[in-house]
């Protein structure tokens, strides 16, 4: 008995945590999927209604607006974060004197929550007290920067704030990847007469495919579940012009008493995350098997 207890002690210790996670994470994921197929309104109902909630979801103009905003936000957020991250990591990879200080500055935004980031950028982008007022006070009276209150441009203010917060983290990922590359490869390329630009473009960056993939997956995950930054910065406005799926889901569940519709939108978001993560995990496992 003592031998069995000693052998299985790690399993016994983690089993309560495992059970809690299994119930409160995966159990509620399954519950959400089930509720999305019911007539649930203010309170959950368990009478099966087929895919009517999903039909209602995809016939809702506000949901289409949220999905369109998500596509705009995701493309710009991922591309700009990776470009800035690569440029900053290459800069720091040159062994400059102020590397430690600059690395701290670039990474500092990641220490803030998206709520703090959204609030700070809301102040800066406010036409009556932010960048626009500062520039007009300098004498440039024709200058306008009212994206925060513009229905057409408000989604781009979310992109600006999100890129500011996340690009430093991407820089850290790429810098770690650059520092893991053997210096002999770079020295050999320089001996062959390759310029620094061609070394990075044709040799180093292609070797960093795992970093690219990891960065893309992380950024896609952040963009799909974007909620707190949107609420703090624009609250989905003006009107619903900067709505995102997570904001739509919360509004339907807690303000419109549409639990079934909110569950359908949550199911769509979850399936989107799976569509991003599963192929990545599959490709990484295949690559590891090939290397072994």
Residue locations for each model-derived region?
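A structural signal for multi-pass alpha-helical bundles of membrane permease subunits
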Residues: 3-292
């Amino acid at each position: 008995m003592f031998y069995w207890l000693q052998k299985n002690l790690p399993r016994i210790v983690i089993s309560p945590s495992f059970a809690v996670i299994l119930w409160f994470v995966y159990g509620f994921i399954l519950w959400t999927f089930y509720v999305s197929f019911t007539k649930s309104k203010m309170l959950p109902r368990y009478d099966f209604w087929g895919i009517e909630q999903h039909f209602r979801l995809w016939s809702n103009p506000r949901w289409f607006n949220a999905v369109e905003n998500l596509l705009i936000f995701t493309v710009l957020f991922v591309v700009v974060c990776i470009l800035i991250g690569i440029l900053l990591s290459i800069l720091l990879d040159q062994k400059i004197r102020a590397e430690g200080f600059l690395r701290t500055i670039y990474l500092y935004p990641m220490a803030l929550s998206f709520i703090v980031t959204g609030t700070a950028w809301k102040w800066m982008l406010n036409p009556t007290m932010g960048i626009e007022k500062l520039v007009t006070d300098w004498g440039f009276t024709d200058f306008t920067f009212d994206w925060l209150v513009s229905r057409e441009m408000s989604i781009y203010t979310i992109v600006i704030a999100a890129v500011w917060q996340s690009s430093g983290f991407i820089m850290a990922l790429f810098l770690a990847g650059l520092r893991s590359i053997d210096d002999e490869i770079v020295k050999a390329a320089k001996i062959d007469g390759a310029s620094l630009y061609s070394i990075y473009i044709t040799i180093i960056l292609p070797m960093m495919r795992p970093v690219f993939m990891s960065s893309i997956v992380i950024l896609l995950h952040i963009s799909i579940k974007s909620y707190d930054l949107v609420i703090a910065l624009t609250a989905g406005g003006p009107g619903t012009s900067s709505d995102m799926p997570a904001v739509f889901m919360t509004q339907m569940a807690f303000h419109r008493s549409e639990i079934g519709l909110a569950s359908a939108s949550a199911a769509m978001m979850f399936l989107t995350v799976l569509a991003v993560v599963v192929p990545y995990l599959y490709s990484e496992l295949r690559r590891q098997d090939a290397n072994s």
